[in-house]
Amino acid sequence: MAQSGPMLAYRHAFHAGNHADVLKHLVLVSVLRHMAQKEKGFRVVDTHAGAGGYSLESRYARQKAEYAAGIERLYDAADLPPALADYVAQVRAFNGDGALKQYPGSPAIARMLLRPQ
């Protein structure tokens, strides 16, 4: 099948922290927490992971500001369900100073939640 037009490059920085990232990373945090409860060692392989972190102040993130409908809506929310609160806590830990300026990618989240084997 012939392609109709130029192939556009995908740059995740435009989409970092959006609703899809929130869902993927919420599941990732929950799965890693569950796996870490077991004594047996485990590996994390993410075939679709992007960068370890993204600046939400970058021109890419600000251009579409998709994070505003994703992580930004949850970041200061109170009374979140436990799994969602745990995920947001990981994003907060990644930011250090409290302000939402950075968004962790899957590699950073996995690294934060791994334990010694």
Please describe what each predicted stretch is.
Residues 38-46:
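Gly/serine-rich nucleotide phosphate-binding loop at the start of the catalytic core
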Residues 17, 47-49:
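Glycine-rich His-Gly loop
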Residues 2-39, 59-64, 68:
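Class I SAM-dependent methyltransferase Rossmann-like catalytic core
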Residues 42-43, 51-117:
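Class I S-adenosyl-L-methionine-dependent methyltransferase module
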